[in-house]
Each structure stands twice: as structure tokens, then as C-alpha cells.
From Swiss-Prot:
Alphabetized UniProt keyword annotations: FAD, Flavoprotein, Oxidoreductase, Phenylalanine catabolism, Tryptophan catabolism, Tyrosine catabolism
Transmembrane segments: none
The family this protein is said to belong to: Belongs to the acyl-CoA dehydrogenase family.
Signal peptide: none
Disruption phenotype: Mutants are deficient in reductive metabolism of phenylalanine, tyrosine and tryptophan, and exhibit growth defects when cultured with amino acids as the sole carbon source.
EC id: 1.3.8.15
GO biological process: L-phenylalanine catabolic process; L-tryptophan catabolic process; tyrosine catabolic process
Residues the record marks as active site: E361 (proton acceptor)
UniProt catalytic activity: 3-phenylpropanoate + oxidized [electron-transfer flavoprotein] + H(+) = (E)-cinnamate + reduced [electron-transfer flavoprotein]; phloretate + oxidized [electron-transfer flavoprotein] + H(+) = (E)-4-coumarate + reduced [electron-transfer flavoprotein]; indole-3-propanoate + oxidized [electron-transfer flavoprotein] + H(+) = (E)-3-(indol-3-yl)acrylate + reduced [electron-transfer flavoprotein]
Keyword hit for Lipid metabolism: no
Protein name according to UniProt: 3-(aryl)acrylate reductase
Xref: SUPFAM superfamilies: Acyl-CoA dehydrogenase C-terminal domain-like, Acyl-CoA dehydrogenase NM domain-like
Binding of FAD, residues: 121-130, 154-156, 266, 277, 334-338, 363-365
Length: 377
């Protein structure tokens, strides 16, 4: 219904890549907190980093359905790999497509799609999480430059970034209408990073604070129009929700796979636990939730590909897929019993990785607000 033969070929390509290149190193990445640069390079070479980016910028020019299929398959092998995949296609690529100049696309977007440049999306602050409009980072005009001061927190990929997309207040009196987007060089004077967070999951893509102290940014590195940064941020996050939702699908599918395999192998009372109705009902509920979530994600991607407004559908997909994935992984761990609590089993990693999906790029509560606001218009 949602996919063409071409989409299915893309899915197979992503699945084969994930099984051959990512699955074998996923547990080691979780232990060492280092994702191999050669795998990142291979993902870029396979066209994954620009799957839905226009061909003129080095992308594949595919659609949102192609993107979610790849996200699903890559995340099935590793949620962390899904982060590396989603960034150029979503949080980091979208702002350039929306408001970037030709020069900015040439300088930042193209190298990012090729896997040669890494960026970070710096919106969240200690006092501005779900209330993104409350950013306190300031940008003061000084001739041909703006001087940035502030602190960003929980920024994915910050310590390994070459450049940072920073949202700062250029007019303190206008609230969300006084926020501007800047492109900042990670290595320039005044930019520093906090200690990488000791995270529960998604280990292998570092997360840290970014400290900006009198950072001098030329006006040519303003991304979009002055005081229009909040609009850019919100549009970017809206587009990105289906990617995160697809990431949830991949992790949930991996959990179902592990639970089915374990239930068939594990014997109690002289027979596989898969023969017990209690386990069968749990597996049935997991599979039903997963397929319901898939339909929501695929429908949102399809509507976006048709050029229809899909804010509500994207939020429904992100909300339901995230919450369902958490429940599915929890049930899969329960099926494993005590072994599910041991790091030698994949389900333990999935349990830690999946939890953040209901938090980042818009919490489940924010998604509910978006859904409700669309209903009550």
C-alpha cells in the first residue's frame, strides 16, 4: 500500500548493509562508546546520508518513505547507527534545505552528505528543553559580526562536530520571534565542550554541553533570516519526527526478533517457553503494537511525500511508535527473564537504547500537545 518495488529494493540494501556491517560491531560500540569511522564512511558511500536530499547537493533525491525504510533497518541493528543516519537527513540537513544560501549548502550540506563533515544541532539549554522558545543564549551585533554567549545542553554529537547550528536570541524583547540561527565553527575561539554525558543508552554517539564565550560569528554565517530561527527549528523538528519514529520501529523489531528466538530456544517444564500461552499472548501483543506503529509511521511518510500537511500524523507516529517500542522492548526483556538483565544478551542494550526515543526531538507529552492542538483548531 505504502511502498513501491523501488522502496523494497532500498529496504533490502539497507538490511543487507546493517546485517553485514553494523550488527557485528553493535555490542562492541556499546562497550567502547566509539562508533567506527569507517562504518560512518561506508554509510555515506552507500548514499544513506543523503537519501532524501536533492541530487544537486549530492543526495539520492529519494522520498520520506525511502528514508524511513532505511532508518528502520539500520536501527534494527543499532539505534546509535540510526542517529548517525538521521542527522544529515533530518536535524542537520533540513535547516540548509529550508533557509540555507547556495554558498552555505555548498560549504556545509554537500560535505555532510558525503560523510566528510559532522554538524551538531544546538537548541536545547539547561532552562529550555520542551520550552524551546526560552533559549537564553544571546547574539549581540557588533559591526559585521554577532558575539554569541550561552550554554547548550544534551547536544548529540557535539564533541565530534566540525560545525554547530546554534539558536540564539538576537532580540530579547521578542521571545520566539527574536531567535536567529547561526553556523558556528566548533574549533573557533570561545567554543568549548562539557564532559560527554555518561548516558543510559545510545552509547557510541557522544552527548555534551556546548559553552559559547564571546564567540565571534560573521553575518554570512547566519542561517536564514534574522529573528526567524525559531520557525526554522520547529519546521526541522517536525520533519525529523518520522525519522525518530522509524528508529523506534527498528529497535522494536529487533526486540520482537530476539524474544521470538529466545522463546523457541529456552525450555522450562520440559518444553520451549514459546509453547506457553502466557508467552504467546505477550508475543502477540508485541507484534500487534509494532505493526500498528508501522502503519502510523508509513502513513505519515506517505502524506509528506504527497505534499500534504502532516504535522499531526508525524506527531502521532513519533508518539505511538516511541511509547509502543518501550513497551515492546520491556515485554521482550521479561520473556528473557533473568538473562534479559545481563549485558551478554542483546535485549539489555535495546532496553537502554529505546528509552530516549520518547524524550529527544520532542517528548511524548509535546507530541500529544501537537496532536491535540491540531484537533482543536
Amino acid at each position: 500500500m505504502f511502498f513501491t518495488e523501488q522502496h523494497e529494493l532500498i529496504r533490502k540494501l539497507a538490511r543487507d548493509f546493517a546485517e553485514q556491517e553494523i550488527e557485528p560491531i553493535a555490542d562492541e560500540v556499546d562497550k567502547t562508546a566509539e562508533f567506527p569511522k569507517e562504518i560512518v564512511k561506508k554509510m555515506a558511500q552507500n548514499g544513506f546520508f543523503g537519501i532524501k536530499m536533492p541530487k544537486e547537493y549530492g543526495g539520492a533525491g529519494a522520498d520520506n518513505r525511502a528514508y524511513v525504510t532505511i532508518m528502520e533497518e539500520i536501527s534494527r541493528a543499532s539505534g546509535v547507527a540510526g542517529i548517525y543516519l538521521s542527522s544529515p537527513n533530518s536535524l542537520l540537513g533540513t535547516p540548509f534545505l529550508l533557509v540555507g544560501t547556495d554558498e552555505q549548502k555548498e560549504k556545509y550540506l554537500k560535505p555532510m552528505i558525503r560523510g566528510e563533515k559532522t554538524l551538531a544541532f544546538a537548541l536545547t539549554e539547561p532552562g529550555a528543553g520542551s520550552d524551546a522558545g526560552a533559549v537564553a543564549t544571546t547574539a549581540r551585533e557588533e559591526g559585521d559580526y554577532y558575539i554569541l554567549n550561552g550554554r547548550k545542553t544534551f547536544i548529540t554529537g557535539a564533541p565530534i562536530s566540525d560545525n554547530i547550528i546554534v539558536f540564539a536570541k538576537t532580540d530579547m524583547s521578542k521571545g520566539t520571534k527574536g531567535i536567529t540561527t547561526f553556523i558556528v565553527d566548533s574549533k573557533q575561539e570561545g567554543v568549548s565542550f562539557g564532559k560527554p554525558e555518561d548516558k543510559m543508552g545510545m552509547i557510541g554517539c557522544p552527548t555534551s554541553d556546548i559553552i559559547l564565550e564571546n564567540v565571534k560569528v560573521h553575518k554570512s554565517d547566519i542561517l536564514g533570516e534574522l529573528n526567524k530561527g525559531f520557525i526554522t527549528a520547529m519546521k526541522t523538528l517536525s520533519v525529523g519526527r518520522i525519522g525518530v519514529a522509524a528508529q523506534a520501529l527498528g529497535i522494536a523489531q529487533a526486540a520482537v526478533d530476539e524474544a521470538v528466538k529466545y522463546a523457541k530456544q529456552r525450555k522450562q517444564f520440559n518444553r520451549p517457553i514459546a509453547k506457553f500461552q502466557a508467552i504467546q499472548f505477550k508475543l502477540a501483543n508485541m507484534e500487534t503494537k509494532l505493526n500498528a506503529a508501522k502503519l502510523l509511521v508509513y502513513n505519515a511518510a506517505y502524506k509528506m511525500d504527497c505534499g500534504e500537511k502532516a504535522d499531526k500524523e508525524a506527531s502521532m507516529a513519533k508518539y505511538f511508535a516511541a511509547e509502543s517500542a518501550i513497551q515492546i522492548v520491556n515485554d521482550a526483556l521479561q520473556i528473557h527473564g533473568g538473562y534479559g538483565y545481563i549485558k551478554d544478551y542483546k535485549i539489555e542494550r535495546l532496553y537502554r537504547d529505546v528509552r530516549v526515543i520518547a524524550i529527544y526531538e520532542g517528548t511524548s507529552e509535546v507530541q500529544q500537545m501537537v496532536i491535540a492542538s491540531n484537533l482543536l483548531k
